[in-house]
Amino acid sequence: MKRFYGPVILLFALAVAAVCVGTAVGSSTNFTAKYSGHVTEVVNGSAVTATPKGTGKASLIGKGTLTGTVAGNTSNPPCSPLSGPGTLKGPKGKLKLKLLTGSRACAAGQDDPNNISFSGNAKVTGGTGVLKKAKGTLHYSGHYDRGTGAFNLKLTGTLKH
């Protein structure tokens, strides 16, 4: 009886190659983070620049801080497009983010302009420590009380690193 080892060896070689390539590319990890803090706003006509500073906790980097600079435009209420960079920093590293097109903040209504919900996606633009090679896009959502300056934020997604 003849045995055909060729196909078996080929399948084994392909399986080993797939494992090696997967390891070389890096791993994917679910990422979650929650932050809260205070926003400082500068309004110039319909242009708004917000500077959030907060504390919280992110998977992979631990307890730490959130900082950023967010640009918005209030000329088309009740929603405003958002853009700008941000940074999450913890004892195990730093993650740099950039808000993507489609990110927005919306007031609850014309009679409640200080009650603002915001959401969108942020692209990872760099990192340090355990997230030095991080890539991916995170979804974020949160609430901002324009009257008090208080905000809370949640980020979720999958990072390749």
Task: Please report, for each region that a protein language model flagged, where it lies by residue.
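Beta-strand-enriched cores of mature, soluble protein domains
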Residues: 25-161
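Bacterial N-terminal signal peptides that target proteins for export
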Residues: 1-10
